[in-house]
Amino acid sequence: IAVAEMYQLDFEEFLLAMGCAQSTIDSARHCFNNNQSINESLHNYFLQQFKIYLLVGGLPEAVNKFIESRNMTLVRQVQSDIHNLYKIDASQYDNERRLVIRKIYEMIPSNMENKKKRIVVKRIENMAGHKQFSDYAEEFEYLTNSGIALAVHAISNPRFPLVESESKNLIKLYLNDVGLLTDILYGLNINAILRDENSINLGSVYESVVAQELHAHGNKLHYYDNKQRGEVDFLVDDYSSLSVLPIEVKSGKDYTVHSALDRFLSTPDYTVSRAIVLSNYREVRTVDGITYMPIYYSMFINGNNGISAADTIIPEVPMPTI
């Protein structure tokens, strides 16, 4: 058995599969592009569909099963089968390396619940001081190249383009599909997602789905990690301004509290003047360079936002007269 790279449906594709009209999505895209809020009824529709997406995810077999039955027991069975497939794959490696790959894969959900979500090498085989990140490079590459996991590289001193200053040894790993994550975390308790249970912190779930959306739209994934200033969930290249766009993800009511992001924006050396905070709240507004947007607007974030098709046409160079 071999795992081919799985391309799951992103949230926009999921909406279309659920019967949402393309014109409705395009209307929301127009609002996103113009920093506008959508109306209350459409907001409620998108938010409810988004919560369902957190449960079902975008793997085609799981989506098809949900459309057929609306039965999360059947969907969870599909997701469990995929978990098991991931665990028994990596057949090209010897048994020891297969076990390491499986261990790293199984660590991802618990890592995401930690305050510092990055991979800590000594926890992989409980061999403190004996192994370095480079010792597991092949295992990490397998998980990311096969599409089983998404790697988000740390940046401590952001510069455009981000790839020039990324850390090769400090990474966070996310599961490739948010439905797989909620299957592990909540099983059949769908109300943990659908009813906003106060006792449940959905931070890791929201981060996971945003990582998935950013990746699906061609963004290279990075996050900000600085000992003095703190951590910001995501950084992406903003090609329209040749700058860096920080993105913070909030699942709770305190979405306007983001001290690390504030410190990030107040650092003159970074020359970054705008940021996005994603949350459950409908209203789009900009305060001190930070634009607050509803979480489902993540389906529109692309580093090429602001660059039109006309901007990519290079005119012919006229031949000079001699």
PLM features per residue range, with description:
Residues 1-2, 219, 271-274:
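Short glycine-/polar-rich loops that comprise or flank the Walker A/P-loop
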Residues 1-113:
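Interdomain motor-coupling "hinge/lid" segment immediately C-terminal to the ATP-binding subdomain
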Residues 8-13, 156, 180-181, 254, ...:
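Conserved nucleotide-binding/hydrolysis micro-motifs of P-loop NTPases
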Residues 63-239:
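Accessory nucleic acid-recognition modules appended to NTPase machines
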Residues 226, 270-290:
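Nucleic-acid nuclease catalytic cores
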Residues 244-253:
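Active-site ExK catalytic segment of metal-dependent nucleases
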Residues 253-263:
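Active-site-adjacent loop/helix micro-motif of nuclease/hydrolase catalytic cores
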Residues 281-322:
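Domain-level recognition of nuclease-like catalytic cores that cleave nucleotide substrates
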